[in-house]
Amino acid sequence: MSKNKLNLVLPPVNTEATVAAATVAPTPPFKTPSGTDTHSLLGKPKTSIDALTETLEGLDMGDTERKRIKMFLSQKEKIGELSDEDLEKLGELGSGNGGVVMKVRHTHTHLIMARKLIHLEVKPAIKKQILRELKVLHECNFPHIVGFYGAFYSDGEISICMEYMDGGSLDLILKRAGRIPESILGRITLAVLKGLSYLRDNHAIIHRDVKPSNILVNSSGEIKICDFGVSGQLIDSMANSFVGTRSYMSPERLQGTHYSVQSDIWSLGLSLVEMAIGMYPIPPPNTATLESIFADNAEESGQPTDEPRAMAIFELLDYIVNEPPPKLEHKIFSTEFKDFVDICLKKQPDERADLKTLLSHPWIRKAELEEVDISGWVCKTMDLPPSTPKRNTSPN
């Protein structure tokens, strides 16, 4: 593969994700109500939804979480085959990675969904392969993974229909909040680590695209990850649309070398620094900028005025590969949080902490024990009707 003068390459085809999708036990074929095969992925499967429900019993989750997933699967069973005609557009939720995400209503059940539309000009065989690979998502049922209703192809677009998270993505929340409190970030990180561990241990899936816009929250306080790489063919077909994603990629991915789930750890660490200080941390902000972020009036003033100059994309990627990684240096952050970020952002993947180490880190242990009202914080930040009493939602 040829490299540019900065010794960087575009992200390679994801052979690992393709292999992972191929090695996972296939979901039983989905059928239309009449029993004929369809390119939609949400007809009722030959095996009942009970088969998926049974798999929940062996997973590490609480009774409330298990009950919520069972309710989701029950709703999913009632929907039947998905098609464009059955989805009423309610508004746009966001865009990125070559697609737009719409809020839609399923007209027969009145269920609200998030529909991601990805425009693809591909041959029929490629289209079928993408739909086939996306079937793996039916198997991904976990408290910290966004639920999947199905996918279909219509008018040159792949539609992926997912669970609607009314709090939105963390990049949108970050714009509203200015920065995200450490106590909130602790719970978010715990959820992301559990989600990544589930994908790896149960489905041999590497996420490949961890960043704030792919971490979603809702007014019930749930935290879920989305947009992970189950379809190697879809990733390959969209290879030129991942400009924003590259800024969160690990040095080894940017250099085109072998990568693993350790690459997701780098992306998580970089995302944490961004959410903690309220701005993308490469190049790092100077002392004056940091002081303006954490000044007493920072919550009212929004983003600091003296931000680092914007870098061209290849200049930015060269910085990620060749310069020291970002750090959390302000005194407002705990020592444990700073250490957690540091072990996520080691330049060499074999020196970077793994998922097991991170899940047992003192900062995560503290987050598990600390009472933090994610629901109240989300509702307060995004002006949503409160669903639980608010407690411990202060910014520090």
From Swiss-Prot:
One annotated GO biological process: border follicle cell migration
InterPro entries assigned to the protein according to its UniProt record, in alphabetical order: Kinase-like_dom_sf, MAP_kinase_kinase, Prot_kinase_dom, Protein_kinase_ATP_BS, Ser/Thr_kinase_AS
Task: Give the positions the UniProt entry annotates as the active site.
Answer: 209 (proton acceptor)
Record's Gene Ontology CC terms? condensed chromosome; cytosol
The molecular function terms of the Gene Ontology recorded here are:
ATP binding; kinase binding; MAP kinase kinase activity; protein serine kinase activity; protein serine/threonine kinase activity; protein tyrosine kinase activity
State where ATP binds. Answer: 93-101, 116
Domain Protein kinase residue range list: 87-364
Q: Which catalysed reactions does the entry list for this protein?
A: L-seryl-[protein] + ATP = O-phospho-L-seryl-[protein] + ADP + H(+); L-threonyl-[protein] + ATP = O-phospho-L-threonyl-[protein] + ADP + H(+); L-tyrosyl-[protein] + ATP = O-phospho-L-tyrosyl-[protein] + ADP + H(+)
Task: List its EC numbers.
Answer: 2.7.12.2
Q: Which UniProt keywords apply?
A: ATP-binding, Developmental protein, Kinase, Nucleotide-binding, Phosphoprotein, Serine/threonine-protein kinase, Transferase, Tyrosine-protein kinase
**CDD domains assigned:** PKc_MEK
Q: What does this protein do?
A: Required downstream of Raf in the sevenless (sev), torso (tor), and Drosophila EGF receptor homolog (DER) signal transduction pathways. Involved in both positive regulation (at the posterior terminus) and negative regulation (at the anterior domain) of tll, as in other terminal class gene products, maybe via the ERK-A kinase.
Which family, according to the similarity comment? Answer: Belongs to the protein kinase superfamily. STE Ser/Thr protein kinase family. MAP kinase kinase subfamily.
**Descriptive protein name:** Dual specificity mitogen-activated protein kinase kinase dSOR1
Biological source species: Drosophila melanogaster
Q: What gene name is listed for this protein?
A: Dsor1
